[in-house]
Design a protein with these regions (language model features):
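Short, structured surface patches at the beginning of a domain
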Residues: 1-157
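N-terminal cationic and glycine-rich segments that engage phosphates or anionic surfaces
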Residues: 161
């Protein structure tokens, strides 16, 4: 039996207070995942490790803790990855889809996204369906939209001499 990997992530833009040791969202993600695991007889007894990228974008996968987690996954030491929702895994539609449909199944790793109601064990030999693809697409668009809004606000502040 492999190790259960908890993956937590929060973007820099979403951090609550500068200098805070850990964001409230990371604490909430951990509590949600731990509550889910406590209610699962199948998963609650597994050895677990946590990987946390606090303040890292989800638009790419060059995140220190994600890469560390993937080293363990590739060494065949992981049985399951659990996240709060698929947007915590990433916000790049193509890459998240590649991980869910190709990489994790090839490596024999189960993926659970608690709030999305997604468990890859229910989709063996199949993808998660249109709802999973649509969620990932929305996550990607959300990130792009937020980026444009931030750039726009910064341009306004620059024109006003506040930045």
């Amino acid at each position: 039996m492999g190790i259960l990997l908890k993956y937590l992530r929060l973007s820099q833009e979403d951090l609550e207070k500068p200098g805070q040791a850990e964001s409230n969202s990371i604490t909430s993600q951990r509590a949600l995942i731990d509550h889910y695991l406590a209610g699962s007889a199948e998963l609650s007894g597994m050895e677990a490790r946590e990987f946390c990228d606090d303040g890292c974008t989800g638009t790419n996968f060059d995140r220190p803790q994600f890469q560390e987690m993937m080293r363990l996954v590739k060494s065949r030491g992981a049985a399951c990855i659990i996240v709060k929702d698929l947007s915590r895994l990433g916000r790049n539609y193509i890459e998240v889809g590649d991980y869910l449909e190709h990489i994790f199944p090839f490596l024999g790793v189960r993926v659970i996204a608690v709030n999305d109601g997604y468990d890859s064990a229910r989709f063996q030999g199949d993808t998660g369906g249109m709802d999973v693809a649509f969620r990932n697409l929305i996550n990607d668009f959300y990130s792009r939209d937020l980026s444009e809004k931030v750039k726009s606000a910064m341009r306004v502040q620059m024109r006003q001499g506040r930045l």
